[in-house]
Amino acid sequence: GRPSARYDAPYCSQEEVRECQDDCSGNAVRDSCLCAYDPAGSPACECRCVEPWRR
């Protein structure tokens, strides 16, 4: 499968990923963090909480 976004998205700063992980760690269900870069949208890193198996 595709490597996790944390490694293959050079646009996501370590700080952003860490912040997202902090946010998600308190989430009972979606406690994994998925950071993705959307080339079609703004050049921003988008992080969201996901279920661990959906990473």
Swiss-Prot record:
GO terms for cellular component: extracellular region. It comes from Californiconus californicus. Contains 4 disulfide bonds. The lineage of its organism: Eukaryota, Metazoa, Spiralia, Lophotrochozoa, Mollusca. The keyword Secreted applies. The keyword Secreted applies. Probable neurotoxin with unknown target. Possibly targets ion channels. Keywords: Disulfide bond, Ion channel impairing toxin, Neurotoxin, Secreted, Toxin. This is Conotoxin Cal22d.
